[in-house]
């Protein structure tokens, strides 16, 4: 995705424009309305072209391993079976680049993407995850101590959850986290 920047506070910049007044595509709306309200995925990468290619690659030891997934869904999601991948596709995702600094600090212009997963593919000793962006936002919001708790992120140490390439799942209602952190303008499921 080219020239993608986060909107200003309380603004939504459409990714896809349609003729019927809805700024989101049918596929995006279907994904939104099917999203889990119990879990979300966090994809943190060091790949600089992640938003141009809309995919990220993770080493197997940093892709949904025991350290990165709630115990109750570890077996079924981490196996990357057809059923596991189908379940993963129901979890909303945040995709971002590694923070530019330590201790919860990143460039104020760094963008994170609210997205949904479209494909998961094993490639040797790594996993490639393709995603479809829904909306951008400022990554620094995830780094702020007062908001990090709502996303189940640890920002109180030198190397935080956003400093290391990894694909993880958090037991958090992402839409409640958006509301608590001032990102309530991002699209939500209609139900």
Predicted segment positions?
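Long, low-complexity intrinsically disordered regions enriched in small/polar
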Residues: 1-34
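Exposed regions on extracellular, virion, or secretory-pathway luminal proteins
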Residues: 1-13, 82, 102, 121, ...
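Acidic/proline-rich low-complexity IDRs
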Residues: 3, 72-73, 152, 161
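N-terminal "first-domain core" detector
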Residues: 21-73
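Sequence-level detector for tyrosine residue identity
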Residues: 24, 39-40, 51, 68, ...
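Extended alpha-helical scaffold and adjacent linker segments that couple domains
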Residues: 34-41, 46-50, 55, 122-124, ...
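Structured alpha/beta reader/binder surfaces that contact nucleic acids or chromatin modification marks
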Residues: 61-147
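Contiguous surface segments at macromolecular interaction interfaces
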Residues: 128-191
């Amino acid at each position: 995705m080219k020239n993608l920047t986060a909107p200003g506070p309380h603004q939504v910049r459409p990714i896809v424009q349609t003729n019927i007044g809805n700024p989101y595509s049918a596929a995006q709306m279907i994904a939104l309305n099917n999203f889990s309200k119990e879990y979300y995925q966090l994809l943190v990468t060091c790949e600089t072209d992640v938003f141009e290619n809309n995919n990220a690659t993770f080493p197997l030891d940093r892709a949904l391993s025991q350290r990165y997934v709630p115990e109750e869904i570890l077996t079924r999601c981490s196996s990357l079976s057809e059923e596991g991948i189908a379940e993963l596709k129901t979890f909303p995702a945040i995709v971002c680049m590694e923070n530019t600094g330590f201790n919860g600090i990143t460039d104020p212009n760094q963008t994170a993407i609210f997205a949904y997963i479209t494909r998961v593919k094993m490639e040797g000793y790594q996993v490639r995850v393709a995603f479809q962006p829904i909306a951008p936002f400022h990554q620094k919001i995830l780094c702020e101590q007062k908001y990090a708790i709502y996303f189940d992120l640890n920002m109180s140490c030198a190397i935080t959850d956003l400093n290391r390439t990894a694909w993880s799942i958090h037991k958090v209602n992402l839409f409640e986290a958006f509301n608590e952190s001032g990102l309530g303008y991002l699209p939500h499921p209609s139900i």
